[in-house]
Amino acid sequence: MLQRFLSLILCILLACPSYTQTIQDTPNTDLRRFFTQAGATYLIKYPHQTGTTITLPPNVTLQFQGGSIAGKLVFNNTQLNGNVKLQGSSISGTLKNKTFNAKWLCYADGKKDDATNINAILAMCNEVLFPKGTYLLESMHKPPYKINKPYHIGIHRSNIKITGEKGAILKTKTKAGTLCIYSKPKDIPHSIHDITIEGMTFMVQNESTEWDPYQEHCHTVSLIGVNRCTIEKCTFRNFWGDAICLNHYGDNTSTGERARNMNVVIRNNQINGYKCCNRNGISIINGQNVIIEKNQLTHTSHSSMPGAIDIEANDKAYTVDNIQIRENRIDHSQGKNGAISVISNKEGAPAHHIEITNNKITNSRRAFRFYVWTDYAASHITVKDNWVDKNTDPWVWDGKGRTQNWVFTGNTFLRKTNKKFGQDVRFEGLTYKNNRLK
């Protein structure tokens, strides 16, 4: 019988008894005779191995404190196995539709590495709650598929919810990504799905004020081929590349599109780059049906990088379609393109059905940049009811491509632009009205 390490702390608390008996193991404990008392707490301080499947009594609490069990446990006809070491902070979750509370070896002290155990938790649990504490991430996730940069944490299965209590911080120091959520390449119909990240704080200890090209692709949260994902009420403090990147596998015309991000909501997040020594706040390189709303983005983007929100596919193999950017507050975006940019490059990268509405942009290098180089690669772009302060240059249009069906209405600018509207872009179907210069 193939055995997997069960080194997780499993507190299965379906009913709390008024009195809890605590039973501790010894180096010679026979597990077949150890678990007999319903409602008891069992302390596992020594390593054990058994070829017998152990059935747990009801309402027990297992606390692994340096010990482990190599074997299989069964509770309420549900088999529990895994490979997590333990002791430390509480995390709750579900496993095969059974609800439990667990104490894992997550030190949450900001000094000792928690990445290995968090990866193991996410391999087992569908719902994970991080209590208040600083979870230092040093070790790396080992992905089954090649991704462009190393990440500390990886998720490559569906139906995962991560929730952070106030003060729950995932902290990194190394030039690596924090969290990558990714599907198997070349299998878009079976992409992983239904991922929620809520209330977490992501902090990168980036002390640099000099731009290092390597860090451009070290994103805090990266999605590669994810369907139905929500990231909300999170805080991103400092970051190397992007705070959030809707990413890809480096696809091109020869490989075809190997992964696509679909039905993504990024809402009510606080994104602060601190020293403007990062790439973008949010990048959409590959995305379909994406909503970015009510986020606050400040101090994002090195002067050589695009800006706070960048919609920019790299190749015509990607999909960028039905993107809604609305009611965001952007301040001190110092990227070369603008606070919000839509780029369709010489390779014919697509940008279709994009709505940029009701955003407020202040103290930034530029509000908007639209770059259309290839005929009809970009179409149906709406820029409506945005407000731009006097410290921010309004726009740049660039490129020589033909583009269709633009609406530019109801925007308020407190400063003139020195750029000719549209530059050399050739519009086929443009509505330009009710824009105000105060």
Label each residue range with its predicted role.
Residues 21-45, 103-131, 137:
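Acidic Gly/Asp/Thr-rich repetitive segments characteristic of extracellular carbohydrate-active
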